[in-house]
A protein has these predicted regions:
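Primarily recognizes the serine-hydrolase "nucleophile elbow" in alpha/beta-hydrolase
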Residues: 56
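Intrinsic disorder/low-complexity segments enriched in polar/small residues
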Residues: 248, 256-258, 327, 360, ...
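Ser/Thr/Pro-rich low-complexity tandem-repeat tracts
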Residues: 355-356, 363-364, 369, 375-376, ...
Length: 391
């Protein structure tokens, strides 16, 4: 990596990276004892790069590309997925998840949440969630609706509506992952996860949904670097240059307005600068922001990392061994901590922070160190949309 002030601090040897990832992916699948790989493709650059790496590592006939549209996000993404499969020579399957989501109540729950803000909402309306501009403080989320006549309206979401909406829409990622693992079980394949470094580091994924995978080949690469790999791998132009989207709501939406607050090129440099301890005034010229705005971005990066710990954490294992005294009538186990009956919490934290969270992100005793920074009971704040905020 370069240094602040250099022309391209995120430059890397693309060909060498492709060769390295190909070899490591092949070894990982072999180590898992799997015969091939399943990749859910959305038509975006991340899944496209992961699919191409899998084909290089395992051969096209041992990679299944899944297209999993639903009624809010469908045709265009699925068509791009088909174009990718044809370019890579890999088999592909399309399964609509609309019926499954209807059966689980995803759309019903989502519509009920929207009607908490727009009581006259109809399913024919399109919608999306947007965040307030980065400020280094409270993040407010609003719902934008578009009526059939083309008129639009935006209203701030109260906390209850926000939580209900996120809980409902997160079902989409979880149902997709269910189908991925169904195919993986059937074929004896590994499931390939597609998050890049920004998504993995900043929590832009759903726990038990798109955050779940057996191998994550590009989770250490900045988005800028993923685009460079897409060019080197020869992906179709429509995929290699496609802007990052959310694939969640029915109105077109970028990750910038939905989650990060900055375009990916700038966000890459902000995360790089935060990890490298680059002072805000030194990074400001490179990212086109004032030093104060860089400090605000650093604050958000730290706060999201605190919240993302939960998303990366393994299950907490409660270990309560019993000694013979507990099984004998009339006898009592020793006191807690005596070694006879105790509870041990084992929750190893696996999130690879390269920079300790700013203490400001830890907030105060009445503001828990999670993704929310509530300003009032009626207004959600810093909890990013793709993951439900903690209680």
């Amino acid at each position: 990596m370069g240094e602040a002030g250099s022309g391209d601090p995120l430059a890397l040897d693309v060909e060498a990276m492709v060769e390295r990832l190909t070899a490591e992916l092949r070894a990982a699948v072999r180590e898992l004892g799997r015969r091939g790989a399943v990749v859910a493709v959305s038509g975006g650059v991340d899944s496209g790069v992961c699919a191409a790496l899998a084909v290089r590592a395992l051969g096209p006939q041992r990679v299944l590309l899944l297209r999993l549209p639903e009624r809010d996000i469908g045709g265009a993404a699925s068509d791009l997925g088909l174009e990718l499969a044809q370019a890579l020579g890999a088999p592909t399957e399309e399964e609509s998840i609309t019926a499954a989501l209807e059966g689980l109540g995803c759309y019903r729950r989502r519509d009920a949440a929207i009607r908490m803000v727009f009581p006259d909402y109809e399913p024919s309306w399109r919608h999306k969630l947007v965040r307030s501009p980065p400020s280094g403080g409270i993040i407010v989320f609003s719902l934008v609706v578009e009526r059939p006549d083309g008129t639009t309206e935006e209203r701030v979401l109260p906390s209850a509506a926000y939580r209900a909406l996120i809980a409902a829409t997160n079902m989409k990622q979880r149902v997709r992952k269910l189908i991925e693992y169904t195919w993986a079980d059937q074929l004896g394949y590994a499931v390939i996860g597609t998050p890049n470094l920004l998504e993995f580091d900043q929590g832009f994924f759903v726990k038990g949904g798109d955050g779940l995978a057996d191998v994550k080949p590009i989770a250490h690469l900045y988005k800028t670097q993923v685009y460079a790999l897409a060019q080197a791998l020869g992906l179709p132009d429509a995929i290699a240059s496609r802007a990052p989207t959310t694939e969640t709501f029915s109105l077109p939406q970028t990750q910038e307005e939905f989650y990060f607050g900055h375009p990916y090129e700038r966000m890459d440099l902000l995360v790089w600068g935060r990890d490298g301890g680059v002072p805000a005034d030194a990074l400001a010229p490179q990212v086109g922001l004032s030093p104060d705005a860089v400090e605000a971005a650093y604050w958000e990066i730290d706060r999201r990392r605190v919240a993302t710990r939960y998303l990366h954490a393994p299950a907490v294992m409660l270990d309560a061994p019993l000694d013979s005294a507990e099984s004998e009538p009339g006898r009592r186990a020793g006191p807690v901590g005596s070694g006879c009956a105790h509870t041990a919490l084992r929750a190893a934290h696996v999130h690879p922070h390269r920079h300790p969270p700013d203490q400001r992100a830890l907030s105060s005793p009445d503001q828990p160190p999670v993704r929310r920074a509530p300003s009032s009971p009626d207004q959600p704040s810093v909890s990013p949309p793709r993951c439900p905020p903690a209680a």
